[in-house]
Amino acid sequence: MKRLYFFLAVLIMVSPVVVSAEEIIQKGEILTLERCVAIALRQQPSILAAQGNVDVYYAKKGQAESGYYPQIDASLGYSRFQPSTVSTGTTTVGISRISTSHSFEQYATNVTASQTIFDFWKTKTQVNIAKLNIDSSKEDLRSTEEQVILDVKQAYYAVLEAQRNLEVAGETVKQFQQHLEQAKAFYEVGTRPKFDVTNAEVDLGNARLALIRAENSLKVAKVTLNNKLGVPEAPEYEIEDNLSFVKYSIGLQEAIDKAYENRPELKSIAFKKKATENSVSLAKKGYFPVLTGNAGYSWAGHEFPEGDGWDAGLSLSIPIFNGFLTKSQVSEARANLLVLTANEETLRQSVLLEVQQSFLNLTDLEAGIPVAELTVKMAQENVEIADGRYAAGVGNPIEVTDANVGLSNARTTLNQALYGYKVARASLEKAMGIR
């Protein structure tokens, strides 16, 4: 029984911890944008993969540092020898006389140690390359995090836009429902023709279809947000509405300077470039000798233990000719450095373009929001005028339809502008390498 308990305890310790979606997000919880970002940074598989890549380079650093330490090996040997039988003559009756030698055993044990004494800093250079690759992988991890944050923000704001559009669609249905009831009342008392009723019914049907589409758009937006959070099976929850307009003030040149200073992709390729420069130096060290110290101790004999002895010495390995291998390795490292230098410039240009585009999009949307707000205000006035004219008997149903559709479109356009501005700001922040 004790063995069973011990086995179960070990199994629990080594088994991966599986966290359910309900443990991450509580049903009915109201999530802020910051909370969503925190969940994604913990749950997104892409971040786990990038972190794993960092761990890989830490392991490679450990491999490179192994050159600083002595290398110790041991071997054990056992052999049994059985000589062949040999004939030594014949007896008087013609029978061969056979003699045999005794078998014997051989034991051998060896322990050897070697230590690189001086290799013209090859090991040190390899360790430096590994450290630079670690730094580069950390920046790649940060780049992955920045992309995850942008994806979460886009999905978060898309849910808010879909919620507001659903509200618009619902209110439009209510407005056309009221208009239908009004048209029926006028028709029943004979002040309006049947056309007004059928026209109102068509408007209501179209509004209900728009409501269905808005409901589906919200569902799609929510499952998309769940995916970006890394919690696809998340329970039902709400999110805080922060879609309102807040001006973001920054100049184009300041944004460009921040991008050149902060972008993890630029830092990553800079570390890769330094690592490649070290690789050129490492390849050149193939021309130089390596001084190694070695020592050994051995036992050997027919019985264990028997004879023993030790040895110690120095060896100097001098490369004389290796078929131009070192020369080709140096050429390869230099070519890789040229490739990285060109890629670095390409990346800088891409970063500049990304900042410029994001800044211009932000500026354009900022200018459009006041216009969209004014359009909503004017559309509301049109609805009031059209409803008043129809109620007074001087308007027609087409005016009411046009006014309500115009208001719905204006409010939807405003929602799109607010969403676009938030996403443009998030894109600009990502382009600048800030959160």
Task: List each model region and its residues.
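Sec-dependent N-terminal signal peptides
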Residues: 4-13
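Acidic, low-complexity, intrinsically disordered peripheral segments
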Residues: 6-7, 22-27, 33-34, 82, ...
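Periplasmic alpha-helical coiled-coil/stalk elements that build and connect Gram-negative outer-membrane
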Residues: 21, 31, 144-258, 358-361, ...
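Bacterial Sec-pathway N-terminal export signals of envelope proteins
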Residues: 21-77, 83, 116, 233-277, ...
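Small/polar, glycine/serine/threonine/aspartate-rich low-complexity segments that form flexible
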Residues: 23-28, 75-115, 238-252, 281, ...
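A glycine-/polar-enriched beta->alpha junction
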Residues: 38-48, 55-70, 99, 103, ...
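Amphipathic alpha-helical coiled-coil segments
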Residues: 49-64, 144, 148-167, 178, ...
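Transmembrane beta-barrel architecture of outer-membrane proteins
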Residues: 106-108, 154, 199, 290, ...
